[in-house]
């Protein structure tokens, strides 16, 4: 398959089928069925979505069209710097090229199924991809800027007991097109095209802390980060991208060597016996191995510290002894902590400790020389806070909707009818 076909909106339709000649020396066959007739007609391949293509792939696509190399830079500028979706508006491209692109390509974002806004300004989008699967993306505002929390998988395979996403089994990895598309859809919503300067942009940071484990989808995540970093396109600074992992030890080293982005580690316990219970991945990569990988992370220094995320769970990991064990555990790692009050979700079985307990925990870390802010919940009222993301499948939502109606319960959350293809253009 040619390189430029990798990120098509959908697989080409099946072109196999019987060959029927107009003349035959044998007996006359029976009339074609409707299905056979449709199969015998050649189908056009699905359009190529330019979002998610690398520079090399865009260059290959244009080369196959007979275009000169400089056109790749121009097209890159229109797609990733200006966010343009209409080929006719790409005025630096020749008219014949624009016509060819319009016939064979699209510049599409994921379809926005639902947008929710929190009282604190947090925004959450439920995005649908061409195959009907969905993921959530969250914008977290901070004064005049903010971070976009991006998902890397539909569902998650890790089943961390305190995380709502972990209750949704892994469906599949997101492609580079779908990861980059989340950011571009958010830019559409905020009108941040062309790419603004670092000082003026609202979507200033990207955190790969949404649904899924990024290091279990490394190739697609790495490709997406490369596109996001390119200073002639979306142009997000490397120091403003943070990748969060639950502790996939072998991939932590590779991430540091190849990507060099900020690293956050979902730690949540200082002792193996506790972490084994709340984070099953610890049974494969225990704390000693995880800390060794963190100490070796390229670029980690006092000026660029690893962030350890620590969800405070009442009676589980919030004691003074836990705080002291944490200090001993991270010795030799340039790091800081984010203490996260547990954000409840239906059926979790956990509780958040009283704030005074969390403050006491933070003070112990602070007195040992570590920065340990308490990260106050954002978007909790729309289930957009840390650990609350989950995108039920269309089938699950339809089943729940049917059950509610059968029980005579009013339901304002019926599954929306939407095309199983990306939505070209700006987000509504």
From Swiss-Prot:
Residues 1-17 have a biased composition (Basic and acidic residues). The active site is at 136 (proton acceptor), 386 (s-methylcysteine intermediate). Residues 1-44 are annotated as: Disordered. Its main location: cytoplasm. Its EC number is 2.1.1.192. GO terms for molecular function: 4 iron, 4 sulfur cluster binding; metal ion binding; rRNA (adenine(2503)-C2-)-methyltransferase activity; rRNA binding; tRNA (adenine(37)-C2)-methyltransferase activity; tRNA binding. The keyword 4Fe-4S applies. It catalyses: adenosine(2503) in 23S rRNA + 2 reduced [2Fe-2S]-[ferredoxin] + 2 S-adenosyl-L-methionine = 2-methyladenosine(2503) in 23S rRNA + 5'-deoxyadenosine + L-methionine + 2 oxidized [2Fe-2S]-[ferredoxin] + S-adenosyl-L-homocysteine; adenosine(37) in tRNA + 2 reduced [2Fe-2S]-[ferredoxin] + 2 S-adenosyl-L-methionine = 2-methyladenosine(37) in tRNA + 5'-deoxyadenosine + L-methionine + 2 oxidized [2Fe-2S]-[ferredoxin] + S-adenosyl-L-homocysteine. Pfam families: Radical_SAM, RlmN_N. [4Fe-4S] cluster binds at residues 156, 160, 163. It comes from the Bacteria. Binds 1 [4Fe-4S] cluster. The cluster is coordinated with 3 cysteines and an exchangeable S-adenosyl-L-methionine. HAMAP family: RNA_methyltr_RlmN. PANTHER family: 23S RRNA METHYLTRANSFERASE, RADICAL SAM CORE DOMAIN-CONTAINING PROTEIN. This is Dual-specificity RNA methyltransferase RlmN.
